[in-house]
Amino acid sequence: MRPLVYPFFVLLAMAPALRAADPPVVFEDKFDKTLGSDWAWLRENPKAWRIREGGLEICVEPGLANNVKNALLRSAPDRSKASYAIEVTITFTAPPTNQYEQAGITWYQKGNPVFKLVHEHIDGKDYMIPGKLPAPEKTVRLRLMVTKDKYTAQFQPDAKGEFKTVASGNLAPGDEEQVSIQCYNGPAGVEHWVRFDDFRIREVK
């Protein structure tokens, strides 16, 4: 009997095509030893951020969206030409205690925050905002998907399993778009550090 080798060769022939179909990564930063290229700090406090054990840690300082400290920004991909997913894993290394203490992804237009996908402490409990979906886990992976005029906000509890959609809606195009990872509304006089891991921007179909 002839050995069944044909399917094996078919799979070999298909492998390059399968690899080519993977969504292309536009930018990736593991925060391994240093920050990747083209990041810029907004209101940097050098004493309140660090690269530690293969991740970026930022101390959650008091403040609001309009005066956040140590926000890390970079130019957003051109969503008029394609759709993109922005992902990062965040971990509260200490339980948040302050009302509206939060960390996550913020979208900027012309230097102003216009949208956020965050893990936020509200009335003693932790939620995903927008959507206010309960999220008691200390670690979540965030995914903000953007098209030319819309967004879809998702997260993975414990950075595992399927992504859950918490909200979707319109995100009108604007000038000078940037994407940021940041945290704010921290307690005064107490160090709460948030860890950011595996930041990635990739093109999606």
Regions found by a protein language model. Give the residues of each.
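Bacterial N-terminal signal peptides
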Residues: 6-15
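Extracellular glycan-recognition regions
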Residues: 21-205
